[in-house]
Amino acid sequence: MHTSTIRSVLIGLALSVLVAANSAAVAETITYKAVLNAQNQPTPNDSKGTGTAEVTYDTTSKTLTWTINFDGLTGPSTMAHFHGPAAPGANAGVALMIGTNPTSPAKGTATLTDAQAADLQGGRWYINIHTNANRGGEIRGQVVK
């Protein structure tokens, strides 16, 4: 009896280790990018500003990490956000705050909800950088794989 109990415990422990290892193997870090410019705004403006974003999403921890570089704006940035859900050229509300008066490079992390992650993974998020001259957004870029 004692041997079969130990054997059952060891088999259960081995199965638990296999399940845990399999779950870790499913974890994934997805890399996204965005190219920001005035022409990507639904109503383009004459800004010469440009930017790029590198964004990663860890599917296990649900952590979003970003670095956004930008320059050539008409003035200091006043706000920056991730917006969504929206297709390219469409507007949407703020999904996630990047910062107030951000400077380049703007860096940050956040934990996403399942709905936010689904919109991000579906290509329905964009980054918008605002200035006093372009309060609705001066440069914008869709976040894509």
Region locations from a protein language model:
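Metal-centered catalytic cores of metalloenzymes
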Residues: 2-5, 12, 17, 22-80, ...
